[in-house]
């Protein structure tokens, strides 16, 4: 399927602006479901743009916001800081990704400038994450899609890592018809998940116990609220196993199967 892609900005409820990547199927002006695609902690990058295009070829209008580009957040979360943080995280072996002592030891070897840049990103996104504000930005992304002439009114969300947690946070607003979580944290408090509008697909890695060990809490809340939920935990897979730009962590077998599940899930719930 031929696609039309565009880099754009959309307005938020507080009159800020968010940069975003838009992918639209080109097929005689037909209307399609929309999907909000939420990036990893690194911000919008070429990997996420590629995922947007892959989804769009399946018949979806996909909007991938770059959440850290708002005037409020771009002051502390700079592109340079994100890049240095990304390079730092990618230098850590998969089995050490959640080892805070190891991370601190490795960071101590860096220059004061790099430590400051990385610490700024960590402080904002890991220690004091503005989840409510970020969810508002995503809610505005849903509004953008609902107003787009190529969208038929059905909206889903999907996110990876940081974006997986934000995907379920957006789902808790009741504004999307289907939610996909790739190894994302539960909403806080997890009871908010009872407000999810419809179905949830959660995809996790067995070797990501900090995240995966809490999934049962989300399942319990959704089951009590009688919301459909499907959970898949891939053995021998690490956090971020879907990202094929990270060869240390990428798990081709798990990624391909997870993609099959995503396509079928959106087909069942959006089309």
Language model: regions and residue ranges:
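N-terminal cap/leader regions of alpha/beta-hydrolase-fold enzymes
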Residues: 1-271
